[in-house]
Amino acid sequence: MSGNTLGLLFTVTTFGESHGPAIGAVVDGCPPGMSLTEADIQIDLDRRKPGTSRHVTQRQEADQVEILSGVFEGKTTGTPICLLIRNTDQRSKDYGNIVETFRPGHADYTYWHKYGIRDYRGGGRSSARLTAPVVAAAAIAKKWLNEQYGTEIRGYMSQLGEVEVPFTDWKHVPENPFFAANADIVPELETYMDALRRDGDSVGARIEVVASHVPVGLGEPLFDKLDADIAHAMMGINAVKGVEIGAGFDSVSQRGTVHGDELTPEGFRTNNSGGVLGGISTGQDIKVSLAIKPTSSIRTARESIDKAGSPASVETFGRHDPCVGIRATPIAEAMLALVLMDHALRHRAQCGDVRVDTPRIPAQAPGKS
């Protein structure tokens, strides 16, 4: 397995399995001299961790991060930062019935055929549990980006199954377990999820992520365009099946007179580009939407096969999220932060001394969106 590292100058390599003794990440390329403590990282981990409501997996993991290297006297040293999160609530016996079978929609079948061996306990390496070290590593990137540029990365759920969640205000996002930017719809979402759990089924979700105060110039055309790397990273999140940037697939029905974001001395009139033109950041908000599929591990019996190729019925009894999208918001924020951090360092290395006479216009003209 060779696809465990993300980034070029700011790299993150994750390790571990869902039911192993620990999971973690090695972060390399972080500039020296930045103040960093475990508490800085723990904030985002607590937003992602399991067992925080009845609507997510009831696996109880504290997800307490340990910094093993790369920080001395409270500051980054420029050397690799090793982050460790110990697994404490594994229950491997729940997976005894899938040792010889494959869950429909899960990585069981493909991992078996590719590697000839698979850790069936909680999905092993393919588990969404491995997003915890990603979130931990990204907390470092978020901190550096904010200190350098004032960059802020926020996300919210805009759809849960068939239920659309209209955006009303960012302040509501931390107030509910769905990361919904709408307080009024939370009771409906809770009723929806309670019914789904009783049915032994699962559902997908749509997540929106926005990065504000991003500097102009991030991205490396042609093949390391900023939006290309964002899409690549987002597709690395478990259960993500679609990525849109800016207007996304709505661009198909837009005319050029609408889609092209007009520039004025006061700022951009619109942001259909999602903050990226020609693979390079414009300084506008970077807007990303994710489509997340329903959880594969469900209590309803499904048709499958066993290792011999014979018909089998599969029902999963482990503790699972009926909608992995509920906890996906901080994970999506994390992936965007990692890509922006890597590209910020790459831009600084090659083009940090580039100067042009044209002024940088505001991200948004007054009265426009």
Swiss-Prot record:
Binding sites annotated in the UniProt record for NADP(+): R48, R54
GO (cellular component) term, any one: cytosol
Disulfide feature: none
Origin superkingdom: Bacteria
Reaction equation(s) it catalyzes: 5-O-(1-carboxyvinyl)-3-phosphoshikimate = chorismate + phosphate
A UniProt-annotated Pfam family: Chorismate_synt
Entry's Gene Ontology BP terms: amino acid biosynthetic process; aromatic amino acid family biosynthetic process; chorismate biosynthetic process
Cofactor(s) named in the record: FMNH2
Protein residues bound to FMN: R125, S126, S127, N238, A239, G278, K293, P294, T295, S296, S297, R319
Bound cofactor: record note: Reduced FMN (FMNH(2)).
Signal peptide from the UniProt entry: none
Gene3D superfamilies, A to Z: Chorismate synthase AroC
UniProt-listed Enzyme Commission number(s): 4.2.3.5
GO MF annotation list: chorismate synthase activity; FMN binding
Protein's UniProt keywords contain Protease: no
Pathway: Metabolic intermediate biosynthesis; chorismate biosynthesis; chorismate from D-erythrose 4-phosphate and phosphoenolpyruvate: step 7/7
Ranges that cross the membrane: none
Keywords: Amino-acid biosynthesis, Aromatic amino acid biosynthesis, FAD, Flavoprotein, FMN, Lyase, NADP
PROSITE patterns: CHORISMATE_SYNTHASE_1, CHORISMATE_SYNTHASE_2, CHORISMATE_SYNTHASE_3
Family: Belongs to the chorismate synthase family.
Role of this protein: This reaction introduces a second double bond into the aromatic ring system.
Subunit structure as annotated in this protein's UniProt entry: Homotetramer.
Protein name: Chorismate synthase
Protein species of origin: Cupriavidus metallidurans (strain ATCC 43123 / DSM 2839 / NBRC 102507 / CH34) (Ralstonia metallidurans)
Gene name for this UniProt entry: aroC
